[in-house]
Amino acid sequence: MSTLNYLLIFILAYLIGSFPTGVLVGKIFFHEDIRNFGSGNIGTTNSFRVMGPVAGSAVLVIDVLKGTLATDLPLIFHLKGPKYLLLIAGACAILGHTFSIFLKFKGGKAVATSAGVFLGYNLKFFGLCALVFLPMLFITSYVSLSSLVSIVIIFICSFWFHDIFLTIITGIMMILLFVRHRSNIKRLINHEENIVPFGLWYWYKKSHGLLKKNAKNK
């Protein structure tokens, strides 16, 4: 294992994670800065809300692939070393997305990019994440709540994989997600958080006339 080679890999992984997908899609195709609309976030949820399902899907796929590509860089370049180094590369991508060098070290909440890291590292663990998150989203209609509850469950489940480094990285991701979702947590407590236009809770509120027009929460 070459320390210099891995250092370069980690830097490249950070730069890949820093790629501001939502901002670029907004500016190139809509001539607007997504940071000035909706929640102001550059990630998937705000992209769907502000730019529509096609652009939102593109942002989702690219942000997931950022995490996957960064995680698998050591494999792509045929570098030898412990498998946990893939997780470190993935963590660098998450840091890049959250603190992008291209956005003055600001960025998104890294939910999609974190999913991409799990996809690149352990397909079964990624499948577990999907099985936890998607039903949670369908039930609650809240992306933020689903993300926070899911990462806690996923962290607990990580112990069953007997991979201490996976558990450590998942724990760090959990802390980071809670920190990055501080404003969402406040809105959830105050019943002001926006919901997605599908799922059981959305359909319940719609059928009872309880839906409110989305506010531009910052």
UniProtKB/Swiss-Prot annotation:
It comes from the Bacteria. One of its GO terms (cellular component) is plasma membrane. It is a multi-pass membrane protein. Pathway: Lipid metabolism; phospholipid metabolism. NCBIfam families: glycerol-3-phosphate 1-O-acyltransferase PlsY. Catalyzes the transfer of an acyl group from acyl-phosphate (acyl-PO(4)) to glycerol-3-phosphate (G3P) to form lysophosphatidic acid (LPA). This enzyme utilizes acyl-phosphate as fatty acyl donor, but not acyl-CoA or acyl-ACP. Probably interacts with PlsX. This is Glycerol-3-phosphate acyltransferase 2. It comes from Lactobacillus johnsonii (strain CNCM I-12250 / La1 / NCC 533).
